[in-house]
Amino acid sequence: MSLSSCLLPFSQSATAPSSSVCSCHLAASFSNFPVSSRDYSFSRSGSLVLNGGGSNLCRRFCGLKLWILKSLNRRQGNNRKHQPVNELTTHSKHTFLSDDERGFAEETRAEDLRPEENILGTDLNDGFHNVGDLPPVSKQLSDDLSDVRRRASLCIAVVGATGELARGKIFPALFALYYSGYLPEDVAIFGVSRKNLTDEDLRSIIASTLTCRVDHQENCGGKMDAFQSRTYYINGGYNNRDGMSRLAERMKQIEGESEANRIFYLSVPQEALVDVACTIGDNAQAPRGWTRIIVEKPFGFNSHSSHQLTKSLLSKFEEKQIYRIDHMLGRNLIENLTVLRFSNLVFEPLWNRTYIRNIQVIISESIAQTEKFSDGYGIIRDIVHSHILQTIALLAMEPPISLDGEDIRNEKVKVLRSIRKIDPRDVILGQYKSSSRDKNGVILNGVDPTYCAAALYIDNARWDGVPFLVRVGTGLIKHRVEIHVQFRHVPGNLYRENIGINIDLGTNELILRDEPDEAILVKINNKVPGLGLQLDASELNLLYKDRYKTEVPDSYEHLIHDVIDGDNHLFMRSDEVAAAWNILSPVLEEIDKHHTAPELYEFGGRGPVAAYYLWAKHGVPWADD
């Protein structure tokens, strides 16, 4: 009877003559193993060979292999997004199991094996009170299977822990992940800053900002207490090697000897970023496990400073360790772009210059300007460089070969490198009037824009001649974040006379709205009920709050989860950063060279009048405010 080979995850140093059938590599001596010596022998290569002593023996070893695979899947499931923890997938079965093993799996599919149960038929600890009393092989199996179940520990350090971003966004996002089970129970969270505080001081600061989402109310108080008990404070300056050494030492105390992973969130001013990163790189990287750092935008002030920043980071870390975060890329709208394009046949065949007339990306804020735009970076460096260009890249990229982060980033950078040099005349800058700024308590310097509109073109076969219109501003009439994809007119439209005077009413349009109410809208033409033939433009809408009765996770929660999971497709790679600066640097240099003054507009208005002329210049209808 021919039995399939069973490759168990062990090695063997002994050697013996070769036999046949079911070869299994083991790490320990089998002198005490509960089978007869005639049932096995050793090959010259050091492999254990199970002789044909009946199917029961191989079935027992195949069962052990199934149990180990199931345990591995149980261990790894916690780190997979949207996948049941205890499910052994069909893919895994067909990849790792032979025909006989699959047959055994069919017989035992309904049985839910407990983690402590030995598939050989008895508990590994049966009859033994201490692990040290176990026979050598059983003890070895117990140790190996214990390793399978053991999870790597995780330490997260927030540098700049007392800042507004950390208090208002980062710690609440970490708590939401902890509540949902996306952080291990024994996670250690460290706050690092220059202030002289204690662990209890940090916990008090954090407690004032933590809340439970509507769908996270069960045992909310208990979860908060547990989360705060896992937070610790380290006093250390931005380039304080002693402080980082103390942080690393305290991490080691918590991690013990097990595999340990570390994340460092650098919530620090741009001028301190390099010092902090280099100090971490020299003193606090994980000795066992991976280390990842999160860097906040903007990524430099211009091409030169961005290059120096990248060079400094890569001198201490590998590219795969660096996660350049833009919280606006954590919105559900951004993740939906690739889903809509590549999972719906109704869209992807039309996603090109033949059918699409223009694409508009709109970010309109009704509130006063934030401090970020008042520090000399301005709206172009802060929003257009990362969020807007990344959105365009995801909209325009070719289908990646897989959903792996590197494959997606490879396609995004191709789009960025294909964007035509921007004509300075196709860039409109605006700033809401000083009286409005004074009234709202925000003081800007004379040239920092609070509004930017621009026309971009992508020089490739898919998008040749299609304008991508961008408008970003604050202090405007309406708060909204939307993407408009306007399709071309129907050739030879039979109903042209029935649509009305404005021919643009007859064009189809896809609207992806993130705020104020997330929705997917499709504008279509339909007949008005009644006698005669009159057409109307209507909207098919998917309103998320009506369709999904759940609170959408915050963008920081989404992105930090991706960092833990190692998913980097929403984070900019260094070549993407450089390509984005190559697009914007010539425009910024022209603005600085000629001291271009932004056009003033009323606070709460529609923005600069020149933006309307820019839309008309490129033949694009203005999306209604």
From Swiss-Prot:
D-glucose 6-phosphate binds at residues 297, 327-331, 365, 382. It comes from the Eukaryota. Pfam families: G6PD_C, G6PD_N. NADP(+) 1 binds at residues 160-167, 194, 297. Forms homodimer. Interacts with G6PD1. The active site is at 387 (proton acceptor). Expressed in leaves, stems and buds. One of its GO terms (biological process) is pentose-phosphate shunt. Its main location: plastid. GO terms for cellular component: chloroplast stroma. Changing residue 212 to S: Abolishes interaction with G6PD1. This is Inactive glucose-6-phosphate 1-dehydrogenase 4, chloroplastic. NADP(+) 2 binds at residues 471, 480, 513, 606. InterPro entries: G6P_DH, G6P_DH_C, G6P_DH_NAD-bd, NAD(P)-bd_dom_sf. Disulfide bonds join 212-220. GO terms for molecular function: glucose-6-phosphate dehydrogenase activity; NADP binding. The gene is G6PD4. There are 6 glucose-6-phosphate 1-dehydrogenase genes in A.thaliana. Signal peptide: none annotated. Seems to be a catalytically inactive enzyme. Belongs to the glucose-6-phosphate dehydrogenase family. Residues 1-49 form a transit peptide. Changing residue 220 to S: Abolishes interaction with G6PD1. Keywords: Carbohydrate metabolism, Chloroplast, Disulfide bond, Glucose metabolism, NADP, Plastid, Transit peptide.
